[in-house]
Design a protein with these regions (language model features):
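Glycine-rich phosphate/diphosphate-binding loop of Rossmann-like nucleotide-binding domains
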Residues: 2-36, 145-227
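Short acidic-hydrophobic, aromatic-tinged amphipathic segments that line or gate anion-handling sites
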Residues: 50-57, 111, 202-209
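Rossmann-fold NAD(P)-binding glycine/threonine-rich loop
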Residues: 93-119, 235-288
């Protein structure tokens, strides 16, 4: 397991608990020194769980399966990776396609959590869903904090775009603040039950022309909009245009969790918080789960350990 080197990354790919799971299954685990520091896990805890703690070069020399959270910030092409090695983690396949192809030509395979399908057979290895849940809750809380004082004098009124894992978590987060039950916007009526179960007070089935969304904004103006609408591997739909933003009014906040996929909001700029001329604040930052490093590492680590076991047993079947 590698120490994370991506900017502001605090998570770790395996917790000591995950190492113990793999060690108990008969696998030998090598952990890069300091890997768990950002999430609060000391090297001694990994040793106590059965791991060998070593430097980066030793990890690559000894490991047949290498796990990370995010791709390393250094060039893998320059490292002495052995043919037959499998790299497990988020791979950013859209942006790293050429590097992944070069590694494959050397006999090094990349297993991407980004592309694990979401169904009943993949629940234990679906790291993307678990991270999305954390991002939804964090995004709601951070957006709420950015509201103007006048918008926080009473229960906050929120609108959540998208009813996937992140959207449902954002809806549920409203209850922890005793806010109004959010309005949920989805593109399928089948999402309605899940939205209400999470705590939504209203469900708006939106169509491609966004007419239903615009009508909702005009009749029930929210203080906070949390954007989560995206399909895995696809560009995010553009749901908030300038007309929609003008309906929100000064002091409202838009949190766009899907900026990396293009964003749901026309004014979103990745890793930036900006106040628009109309007074609406639009914000995004990379890696919302990293602000909750310990629970995020436990969730990610459980998926990573399960994936490593599947690979070791020859039962993994993901891109």
């Amino acid at each position: 397991m590698l120490r994370e080197t991506a900017p502001r990354e605090t998570r770790v790919a395996l917790t000591p608990e995950g190492v113990r799971t793999l060690s108990t299954a008969g696998l030998r685990v090598v952990v890069e020194a300091g890997a768990g520091q950002g999430a609060g896990f000391a090297d001694a805890a990994y040793r106590a769980s059965g791991a060998v703690v070593a430097d980066r070069a030793t990890v690559f020399e000894r490991a047949g399966i290498v796990v990370w959270v995010k791709p390393p910030a250094y060039e893998l092409d320059s490292l002495p990776l052995r043919a037959g090695t499998t790299l497990v983690g988020f791979q950013d396949p859209h942006y790293r396609r050429h590097e992944i192809d070069r590694l494959r030509a050397r006999g090094i395979e990349s297993v991407a959590f980004d592309r694990v399908p979401r169904d009943e057979t993949t629940t234990e290895i679906d790291a993307l869903t678990t991270m999305s849940r954390i991002a939804g809750g964090v995004g709601y809380a951070e957006g709420r904090r950015l509201l103007s004082p006048s918008r926080r004098t009473g229960p906050v009124r929120a609108l959540v775009l998208g009813c996937g894992a992140a959207g449902l978590a954002a809806i549920a987060a409203a209850r922890t603040f005793d806010d109004e039950k959010p309005t949920a916007v989805g593109n399928r009526l089948a999402q309605r039950d899940a939205a209400f179960e999470a705590g939504a007070g209203r469900f708006v089935p939106n169509r491609d022309d966004n007419a239903a969304l615009l009508e909702s904004l005009a009749t029930t103006t929210p203080d906070l909009v949390v954007c989560t609408a995206v399909h895995r591997g696809s560009p995010a739909p553009r749901l908030l245009d300038q007309k929609a933003l003008d309906l929100l009014g000064p002091g409202a906040v838009v949190v766009d969790l899907v900026a990396k996929a293009g964003g749901n909001c026309v004014a979103t700029v990745a890793d930036r918080t900006a106040t628009l001329p109309n007074g609406v604040v639009v914000t995004h930052r990379s890696n919302y789960p990293a602000s909750r490093p310990e629970p995020a590492s436990h969730a990610y680590g459980a998926a990573a350990a399960a994936m490593v076991l599947r690979i070791a047993r020859g039962t993994a079947d993901v891109p």
